[in-house]
């Protein structure tokens, strides 16, 4: 039974996901349905965590919008995500960057890795 579930999940995994880690700034293209129309909405922020594996894998991106911190959690393999772009790679020493919630302004910056 477990093998069948794993095979079904494997068929639903997206193949075009770029390799990004916490600390990277990502731009997520999300499909939004408004009435009869479907449009693409961008969310650009720092990836502060990745958790889970397989079909249940998620990541959380954080940005500051008009002085207010906004965090949004996305399932990695959802069909609602059109694509994920990596804007810049950040150098961090933690897997979960929850400490950024307490930082304001320049203290919340992350050092960039040149690749």
Swiss-Prot record:
GO molecular function, one term: structural constituent of ribosome
Keyword Membrane applies: no
Keyword hit for Ribonucleoprotein: yes
Record-linked Gene3D superfamilies: 2.30.30.790
A Pfam family per the record: Ribosomal_L19
Keywords, alphabetical: Ribonucleoprotein, Ribosomal protein
GO biological process, one term: translation
Gene Ontology CC, one term: cytosolic large ribosomal subunit
Family designation: Belongs to the bacterial ribosomal protein bL19 family.
Purpose: This protein is located at the 30S-50S ribosomal subunit interface and may play a role in the structure and function of the aminoacyl-tRNA binding site.
Record-given protein name: Large ribosomal subunit protein bL19
Organism listed in the record: Brevibacillus brevis (strain 47 / JCM 6285 / NBRC 100599)
Species classification: Bacteria, Bacillati, Bacillota, Bacilli, Bacillales
């Amino acid at each position: 039974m477990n093998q069948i579930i794993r095979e079904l999940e494997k068929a639903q995994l997206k193949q075009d996901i770029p390799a990004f880690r916490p600390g990277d700034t990502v731009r997520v293209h999300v499909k939004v349905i408004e009435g009869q129309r479907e449009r693409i909405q961008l969310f650009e922020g720092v990836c502060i965590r990745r958790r889970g594996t397989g079909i249940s894998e998620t990541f959380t991106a954080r940005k500051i919008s008009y002085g207010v911190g906004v965090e949004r959690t996305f399932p990695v393999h959802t069909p609602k995500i059109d694509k994920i772009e990596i804007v810049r790679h950040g150098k961090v020493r933690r897997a979960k960057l929850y400490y950024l919630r307490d930082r304001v302004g320049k203290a919340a910056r992350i050092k960039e890795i040149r690749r």
